[in-house]
């Protein structure tokens, strides 16, 4: 549940790898669907499963050659993955040492989902 222009922070300081199932993510990065569709010649040789995975995290957005990629939400990792690697895959970075889930949970404008795992939803 994230408003347009909002932010999702994935807080998991124990995570050190981007994807063992989809190693191509480190070459491709996470983007909206239009980013791939409108640059198909650049991405046509990647496995479609990898491309699909790279759109699932980012979600809705648009892409054109003039304005570039414009995503509905910002996705930020607060993990054990380095800042350089996080930014290289087109995600924002937050040092997990600066995250206080208890303080965030006390903020009425912030939704904290403990142990969210793979249970991410978008309401219409």
Where are these regions (language model features)?
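C-terminal catalytic subdomain
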Residues: 1-76
């Amino acid at each position: 549940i994230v408003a347009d222009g909002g932010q999702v922070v994935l807080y998991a300081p124990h995570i050190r790898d981007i994807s063992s199932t989809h190693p191509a993510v480190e070459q491709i990065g996470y983007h909206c669907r239009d980013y791939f569709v409108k640059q198909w010649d650049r991405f046509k040789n990647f496995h479609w499963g990898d491309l699909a995975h790279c759109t699932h995290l980012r979600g809705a957005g648009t892409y054109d050659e003039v304005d570039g990629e414009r995503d509905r939400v910002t996705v930020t990792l607060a993990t054990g993955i380095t800042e350089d690697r996080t930014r290289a895959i087109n995600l924002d970075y937050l040092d997990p040492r600066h995250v206080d889930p208890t303080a965030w949970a006390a903020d009425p404008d912030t939704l904290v989902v403990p142990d969210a795992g793979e249970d991410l939803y978008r309401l219409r």
